[in-house]
């Protein structure tokens, strides 16, 4: 967890993400964002921070979403990468393709911000525990990037994004009890403390995070100091 920013009750995640981009302090970072952040001001903030942005586009930007789909059917493919994961009755194939925007965005308000269109096609077969039959699901997602990027880079970035969504956010919500918290006075302070504890436990991981949290709670001050690296030679 590199940064944590409180969101004002009268605001939302969009301006907060723009502020966060400006304060990362990481040279030329690659940042992935949900469709909520597919905003021109966010791309402007990314350009100021010298960041490469990969942002999902959905129907909250209907014109751009349709243009992205049109580009993927009419313009040249620049690169493509595929991967397959099998295990525990699950078989997933991902095909990531990067396209040149061509002339479709010419003259549009998005033209200065979009250097590449990314299509992610995902097909999953899951074996039913009841029937033994494979159930197939498929989905296609579209992303826009403010810099040219290879399909392999886009594949790693988009997959890593959902890995964070599934692991970090779930852990904070369930293992660290964020969803169950009823703290109303300075909740941001406690959110930062959870992030601090999460980072320490993850850096000293032995078993599952829930098990390590339990061990740390039983270990007293000595165990906590050891996790923090205090007093070690």
Can you say where each PLM-predicted feature lies in the sequence?
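Short, well-ordered alpha-helical microsegments
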Residues: 14, 39-43
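An anionic, glycine-rich sequence signature occurring as long contiguous blocks
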Residues: 52-160
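Short, ordered loop/turn segments at secondary-structure junctions
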Residues: 6-7, 36, 58-60
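A short, flexible helix-boundary coil/loop motif
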Residues: 171-233
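Electropositive, glycine- and tryptophan-enriched low-complexity nucleic-acid-binding patches
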Residues: 1-29
